Amino acid sequence: MAYGVKIAKGDAYKRAAIKRRHIRIRKHISGTAERPRLVVTRSNRHIVAQVIDDVKGHTLASASTLDTTIRGGESDKSAQAKSVGALVAERAKAAGVEAVVFDRGGNQYAGRIAALADAAREAGLKF
């Protein structure tokens, strides 16, 4: 394999494909101080969004379904993703970030990923 990810069967194959796509995406996407990278990490149960300055290697803002403000709220995972998107946008704007580069993390831009991105846009982040 060109990207060094071992191919397996079942769920391991799906995770390897996501990892392979994320490596390919990261070749073209990088966050700077002016436009940091909004990276979304998704599991079966939770979703995490981080605003990262890749030049310095610092996380400027983050939000997750594990945050106490979101945890125990909506039971629908798409609604939780919307809450995470709005919260990460609010925290990013508090850190002085207005525009970001969106990194979907190798996942399809649909469902929870799209819900998070739409909520972040509605909250004022530009991408």
UniProtKB/Swiss-Prot annotation:
Task: Share an example GO biological-process annotation for this protein.
Answer: translation
* Gene3D superfamilies for this protein: 3.30.420.100
Report if keyword rRNA-binding is assigned: yes
Q: Which UniProt keywords apply?
A: Ribonucleoprotein, Ribosomal protein, RNA-binding, rRNA-binding
CC annotations in GO: cytosolic large ribosomal subunit
List GO molecular-function terms, semicolon-separated: 5S rRNA binding; structural constituent of ribosome
Task: Name the domain of life.
Answer: Bacteria
Family, according to the entry, reads as follows: Belongs to the universal ribosomal protein uL18 family.
- Give the function comment from the record: This is one of the proteins that bind and probably mediate the attachment of the 5S RNA into the large ribosomal subunit, where it forms part of the central protuberance.
Q: Which NCBIfam families match?
A: L18_bact (TIGR00060)
Name of protein: Large ribosomal subunit protein uL18
Native species of this protein? Streptomyces avermitilis (strain ATCC 31267 / DSM 46492 / JCM 5070 / NBRC 14893 / NCIMB 12804 / NRRL 8165 / MA-4680)
Query: What is the taxonomic lineage of the source species?
Result: Bacteria, Bacillati, Actinomycetota, Actinomycetes, Kitasatosporales
